Amino acid sequence: MEPLRILLKSLAAVVATSCAPLLAQTMATKPTIGGFLFVTFKGQQDPMDEQIYFALSKDGRNWTALNDGKPVLVSELGEKGVRDPYLLRAQDGKTFYLIATDLSWARDRSVPRSVRAGSRSLVIWESTDLVHWSEPRLVAVAPPDAGCAWAPEAVYDVDTRDYLVFWASTTKRDNFAKHRIWAARTRDFKTFSAPFIYIEKPSAVIDTTITYDGHRYYRFTKDETVKAVTLESSPKLMGPWTPVPNFSLATLRGHEGPECYLVEPASPGKPATWCLILDYYAKNMGYQPFVSHDLATGQFAPGEGFTFPFHFRHGSVIPLTSAEYQRLEAAYSPGNSAAPAN
């Protein structure tokens, strides 16, 4: 029974981390992942740095840039720049939604303006094959008095059967004193519910990401006041949330944009491997990897054997089927690059 218990736990973890449609298999079959897709942006020195870049990996550790290192998607809407892209596989298993911050610091580096008078909208693309994408759309989600809508992410809520979309905003009601995490609900990423405050802390908070391990949700958030990443857990998306004791990275400073993904499911005699990546913005070093074999312990060690073709900035990772991996590789392999869609 022990191998079966481990296998069932492994299946639950993989399904919960955006693989549900990917891994509809019999319980007698060990789940397999055909590869991983990383969506990111490059920086803010040039307007084209703040667009959407793709990278592929077979093992979730060693990454290869697609499209000859050029952007795959470009936004000419709103502020004509996109940051912090988040890619989600929909529950139907056929649709992908890519949501991003509407912001270009390369065009305007005024921090006060970006916080007090920036975009209230998200830039959204959708696709059914990760190669052919819709035209981008700009959708206002933040409250009318918001000064920005940063680092959006989304997760399917099994209790309400819709998507919880969340982001960081400041608001005029407190003179833009601090960021809070706001949220709204949607079923189609076209129409959204009225926004509401999802995370309220004494300090400013940004860059929330949520991972499910098959038992509990784990929520990483950047405390913008002390410049540290925090970790909480909960049995449900709407809480209650409690801090994970002994989080080993709690004393790190200068990191943001946390993303956590399952590199390898557990198997008999071998624990799962999770990767937490943190954007080391303070040193302009891009993402730094850390690994854990049990999110509940809060223990992470520096990741070894990871390679990146350039400094990946705040982005996201999804697992792929073998067919999806091959399709992306064929469409954007060296010498077969495509003009960016917009």
Kindly label every feature range from the protein language model.
Residues Q25-N342:
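Carbohydrate-active catalytic/glycan-binding domains of CAZyme proteins
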Residues M1-L8:
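Twin-arginine (Tat) signal peptide motif
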Residues K9-P21:
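Bacterial N-terminal signal peptides
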